[in-house]
Amino acid sequence: MKSLLFILAVLGSTLIIAQSPVGIFSNHADIGKPKIAGSAVFNTADQSYALKAGGYNIWFGRDEFHYAYNKIKGDFILTANFKLIGKGTDPHRKIGWMVRASDQDDAAHMTAVVHGDGLTTLQFRRLRGAYMRDPQDQLFSAKRNVEIIQLERLGKLFIMRIANAGEPLQEIGRTDAAELPDEVLAGIFMCSHNPDVPEEGLAWNVRIEQTVPDSHNGYRDGILASKLEIMNVFDGKRMIIHEDKGRFEAPNWMPDGKRLLFNQGGSIYTIPIEGGTPEMLNTGTAKRNNNDHVISFDGKMLGISSHRDGMPNGGSTVYYLPLAGGTPTMVTDSTPSYLHSWSPNGKELVYTAQRISKSPAFNIYKKPVNGGPEVQLTFNEKGLADGPEYSPDGKWIYYNANQTGTMQLWRMKPDGTGQEQLTFDEYNNWFAHISPDNKWIAFISFPTTIDPGDHPFYKRVLLRLMPVSGGAPKVIAYLYGGQGTINTPSWSPDSKRIAFVSNTGPINK
């Protein structure tokens, strides 16, 4: 019996040792026994991956490379930035994403890859042991030397998209992979294309997002996990600081720059920007807080939207209270009202509201915090005007509205005059957030397939940045999110970073 227990213990230890987690990946290993051993190292300071690998190639009937991967089922999106280090020896050294049936060297796979000479392709082996052919077993991109690679599985279909910094994703091709099992390996890889030479590469902003069908309703059909992220808007580097299987939303950056504030389960929480355990903020009798909460420009007060039982259309009501917590003071009697901004002088709150007696449309209103009449600023008879936010100098209120047929960004003077459209593209653009230095507008863009009057959960969305002074928007992030991602102001006090929420499956009922 002792001998049997000893053997079982050794086998158990072997199984544990065989798994080598790195960052978000449960394992990394050489595939195909390359002559030169590879490695994957996770840098916690910036959440990047340093890859090193040998390997003759990923081609013909078998492969050699280094692989960091997870087992995953169902539909998913893989997105990352990639860079090969140095000039390299072989022009076909390669780095990218791979989805693989197994860790066998002849396994079926789908590989989205950029080579040392800039060649960018979707390559595949449809059956185990099949001999990969050129050009039959790859889809070519006319664009070369890309940095951002995305590979999506949608049922049996695989879609590859690419971009460089600032660009929207461009689809280069799609193909089916009927022979790949539901459970696959998915991860980042590196291959030197020369068995006698190691090569190195980097991957950052590495994201694996499990998706749900477009018909999924985030209120009705279950929620996905939430990730709280911080991003430098100028270099695009992202950091995940907090994760939860439940739903949290809409981070605000606290005035000291050291903490974030967000809502979850009807309550308000704060968390250090390095991560840690969230702390609940006392909001008194307001127990059903939604994702419309805003910190005053002087950093002393918090405005919130909280639901009142028995009131029309959900009863969302605007309140304010000390940022340190305390008893809320009600501002809006009529519902629904959804807060989006303080005035810079702290005397008014501006919000979107539906007033059925005036119009079925949602319009923008403002009201003094210490009492006074509600003032209507937009007068749309149909559709939606939402997300009003004062510029730091108090000269403009930025907002989004869909009277042109798509949701676009607008601005107006604080009295509602001088309305002018700012964006003119095919996306549905929501929630203009102005940097504290009054130089930049960060906002979220939904795809053309979304109803212009809706900003639902769990969609393929973009975060974009444009100058306040005018100019074309550029993409700063690709993510799976939407409602709750960036509904309210989320700039850091130094105007260099924003905070936002992204989502991933599986579904939690």
Where is each model-derived feature located?
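Detector for intrinsically disordered, low-structure N-terminal pre-sequences
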Residues: 9, 15-16, 30, 349, ...
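Short secondary-structure capping/junction motifs at helix and strand boundaries
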Residues: 2-4, 19, 90, 327-330
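Sequence signature of WD/YWTD-type beta-propeller architectures
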Residues: 213-509
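Extracellular glycan-recognition regions
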Residues: 19-217
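Bacterial Sec-dependent N-terminal signal peptides
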Residues: 1-21
